[in-house]
Amino acid sequence: MELGLKNRVALVAAASQGIGYACALDLAREGARVFLCSRDAERASEAARRIHEETGATVAGIGADLTNDAAAEAFVALAKEQAGTIDVLVTNGGGPPAGVFDDVDVRTLREAFELTVVSAIRMAKLVLPTMKQQKYGRIINITSMAVKQPIDGLLLSNTMRAGLTGWSKTLSNEVAQDHITVNNVAPGYTLTEQQHEHAITRARKLGKSKEEMLDVWAAQAPINRLANPEEIAAAVTFLASDRASYITGITLQVDGGWSKGLL
């Protein structure tokens, strides 16, 4: 199926590993020109090199901390300078630390807000003028299944991702007339480096091994396994494509049936 992504210019945040990397790789496979970033410039460059070698696509890896105004501006400016435009933005701020209410202080709350919510809004602010001018754009935010059903022990993630979802839905209505779509992808438990770290943290509190914790999570989904990052990326790529031109303002769950809600 032709997705209409050939020669589109895509920015993917936090893409040196995990879901972000899988998104950058899948977009490159479809022929998009990809600019990816990571806080670690060396890891970003290495990720870009691997994707280019596998796909032959033009891929640039840039060191950028998107919680910093100047770094985010430089990332977007570089993409515009080299590619001339920006068609697709994938925000992927990463999850804030696990914890319950008693673990959270105001400083941690602010840091989580900056990481998960403000970084995505900042990037949208930077790319939207270009998208509006060309009357085309795709913004996809990586959130979490927690926006449908909050997860015990992830108070910060539950709170921040719900806020990001409200912003995204509102923005989708504001920019629809400019042929810009804004959607979210809400992954379930996914086999990433971060998920393994979370498994270790939860396992210690519950007196289990990491492997036992991963098995517990897998059993919570009717599909009875955890997702691979590539399965999340496939949903992102579809929403970034011309095939999804009439889809906006949604949160697409990719959770193996984990969420029990009807809507």
Predicted segments — roles?
Residues 149, 237, 248-263:
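Short C-terminal tail/terminal secondary-structure segment
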Residues 90, 176, 181, 247-249:
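Short, small/polar-rich loop/turn modules that mediate ligand/substrate recognition or access, typified
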Residues 124, 160, 168:
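Active-site helix of classical SDR
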Residues 100-101, 105-113, 139, 217:
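Substrate-binding pocket helix/loop in short-chain dehydrogenase/reductase
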Residues 144:
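Residue(s) in the substrate-gating loop at a strand-loop-helix junction
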Residues 9, 14-18, 40:
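Conserved glycine-rich cofactor-binding loop
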Residues 129, 173-174, 245:
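Alpha-helical segment proximal to the catalytic Tyr-Lys
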